[in-house]
Amino acid sequence: SQEMRVQKELTLFTHTAMNRLYGESFIVYNPEFQELKIHESYTRQKDGNIVKTPENAFVEVLPSAAADAPAYNGLKEMVVVHTGLELGATIYLDYSVITRPGYLPELDVCEQIEELSPIREYVLSVSVPENKPLHYELLNGKAVPVVKTAGGVKTVTWALKNVQPRPSMLAVSLPAGNVQAIVASTYASKADALKVIKRQFESNDKEVSELAKR
């Protein structure tokens, strides 16, 4: 199985950040093969008051990208509506997406680092069994990860400080290849990864016909 755990702290300094950019968090997952666990979600206001995210602020919807794609209508997007927001408040969110064995053939990570706002501290760790090959790289950056092995587990950790924001324009993006990103994979080779991608495009004609009728 695989677990992706995300922990974030985000302090609001502008009305744009509070009302447009960071008032909600979005988590996409496939409930047929994945489980979402919210460990913590709250807002620490400027005076130190804690406002826990109420149950009705966790809203499950269909991802907008899947709206006109019946084959993907089983996907879910958890919208976490952060409450108690004000200038100077800090949002705390800690969650895991746990994938059952057999759904993902290998670990395959591609995480963009830069956001529209500056990041004081960014940490990403990847842990795999010690005997599992792991290929990794920081794209468009020079930071060197720390590699540790303990208890039969190998962990690779990147820690970046004071990451500058990316420009808000379409020409600057992960697909364009001009932002910092961390990639990591346990595929033995690129050829093995391509085989998995190729299988996704192979389908039974009958299945396609039935899907088209929906």
What are these regions (language model features)?
Residues 11-15, 31-32, 129-131:
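Short solvent-exposed strand-capping/beta-turn motif centered on an Asx-Ser/Thr pair
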Residues 1-27:
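Early extracytoplasmic/domain-onset interaction patches
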Residues 79-85:
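Exposed beta-sheet edge/beta-hairpin loop segments within beta-rich domains
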Residues 98-214:
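Secretory-pathway-linked proteins and extracytosolic
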Residues 30-78, 103-110, 136-158:
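Solvent-exposed beta-strand/loop surfaces of large extracellular or lumenal domains
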Residues 18-52, 184-190, 194-214:
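Carboxylate/His-rich catalytic cores and anion/metal-binding grooves
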Residues 8, 89-91, 124:
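Cysteine-centered nucleophilic/redox motifs
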